């Protein structure tokens, strides 16, 4: 039977107090507590509080990563805003404003290359306006073919985007889908079902449209660059949710089910799984990041908030569970066996 020394090259260390910074897999005997201990890896997923935004808002745009995000536009009560802020992982800083104040628009991109399109301007007009962010300022570019609000978007920069779904006064909920190539929008195949208030994630050639209205839908559709096809539904239907990630590794959080929710679900390319909730239930917040490192900011609890939450999924380090003490304290011992049938000698 293989011993600890044969695996690690050393005997089990005997100490009076636990190491302050043990290595993963390290084992030691604490003579003070008379406990044999070790260190292991624990998989953990959790939301934590980030820095507050300077301007409270909901129905705004979001782009970027957890440590380099952009928040822009939205509704600040009692009016829409042009305010733009960037996030460095701890603090929000105001930068140059958008040209057109609006809410309920779609967005995508990074902190230095973002796009905002569609939405609603006072006193309730649906717009097709598209603005491009270059890391310093906003510039108006070519309009959407269909003016609408409450649409979703996907894309990695201000030169590549997908706009889908939404609502117009004439048609109500729509399934219209348009692709942005950096200079113009082109109409392509529609969603399989007309929806508004849905969440979007992914790229212009590989995207997900998730949830939305009518009702509080759980429907999920996948865009393959040519057409939409239905995939497995969310576990909890909702509208007004936020999203991050890709079609292979996605994240949806918040929104409204029967009430505003903190529920978070992960997507593995084929199905949704529930995971740990946000700290604050809310909808219509900005979102950014990836499945393992996401950001949710602003939103409507109510009242409208400035709160930022950071999602981290990965490996954290924690202590092993302590077992029973040896009958005789000793050092330089050998051991063999299994966790439930072990032998210590020498």
Identify the meaning behind each predicted range.
Residues 1-346:
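Polar, enzyme-active/binding microenvironments
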């Amino acid at each position: 039977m293989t011993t600890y020394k044969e695996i690690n090259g050393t005997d089990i260390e005997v100490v009076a107090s636990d190491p302050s910074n043990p290595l993963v897999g390290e084992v030691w005997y604490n003579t003070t507590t008379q406990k044999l201990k070790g260190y292991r890896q624990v998989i953990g997923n959790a939301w934590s509080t980030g820095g507050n935004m300077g301007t409270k808002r909901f129905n705004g745009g979001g782009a970027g990563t957890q440590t380099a995000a952009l928040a822009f536009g939205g509704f600040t009560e009692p009016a829409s805003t042009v305010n733009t802020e960037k996030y460095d992982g701890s603090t929000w800083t105001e930068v140059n404003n958008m040209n057109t104040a609006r809410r309920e628009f779609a967005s995508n991109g990074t902190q230095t290359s973002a796009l905002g399109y569609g939405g609603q301007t006072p006193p309730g007009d649906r717009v097709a306006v598209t603005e491009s962010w270059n890391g310093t300022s906003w510039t108006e570019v070519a309009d959407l073919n269909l003016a609408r609000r409450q649409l979703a978007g996907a894309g990695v920069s201000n030169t590549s985007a997908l706009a889908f779904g939404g609502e117009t006064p004439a048609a109500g909920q729509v399934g219209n889908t348009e692709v942005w190539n950096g200079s113009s929008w082109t109409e392509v195949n529609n969603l399989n079902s007309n929806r508004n208030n849905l969440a979007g994630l992914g790229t212009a050639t590989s995207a997900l449209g998730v949830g939305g209205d009518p009702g509080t839908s759980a429907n999920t559709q996948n865009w393959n660059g040519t057409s939409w096809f239905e995939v497995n539904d969310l576990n909890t239907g909702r509208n007004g949710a936020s999203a991050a990630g890709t079609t292979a590794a996605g994240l949806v959080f918040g929104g409204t089910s029967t009430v505003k929710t903190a529920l978070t679900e992960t997507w593995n390319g084929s199905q949704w799984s529930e995971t740990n909730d946000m700290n604050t239930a809310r909808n219509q917040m900005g979102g950014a990041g990836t499945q393992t490192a996401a950001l949710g900011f602003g939103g409507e609890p109510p009242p409208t908030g400035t709160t930022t939450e950071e999602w981290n999924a990965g490996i954290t380090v924690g202590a092993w569970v302590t077992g029973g003490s040896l009958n005789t304290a000793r050092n330089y011992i050998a051991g063999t066996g299994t966790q439930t049938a072990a032998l210590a000698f020498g």
